[in-house]
Amino acid sequence: MSNCPKSITAFELNEWLNSEIEDPIIIDVREYSELEIASFPKDFLHLPISKVSVDFVKTKISDSKGKKFVVLCHAGIRSYNFGQWSLDNRLVSEIWNLEEGIDGWSKYIDQKIPRY
């Protein structure tokens, strides 16, 4: 079991999402107001960092056993912390953190997503 979140770049995640490999579950930990500005273009699970608790996260991911998770925020810091917290609380056994968050995704993959 990994003891820290793995890093994944926007390029690597885009490649993963466009491959034949099963898509990861994308977790976006930004707040509602941030989603209104810039939303991730693929299906994602919204777990706002301000609402996170062990019970809340368990109920949201309970039927995702064996799945791979990628977490994102605006720049990659809150998502890294969420990933570490998820590992520390044994909610997941493995999790990837999107480096540079939605900002990196907008910069490198989809320039139509507003930057803020």
Give, region by region, the residue ranges found by the protein language model.
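Rhodanese-like catalytic fold shared by cysteine-dependent sulfurtransferases
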Residues: 1-24, 32-68, 77-116
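Short, surface-exposed ligand- or partner-binding patches at beta-edge/loop junctions that are enriched
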Residues: 72
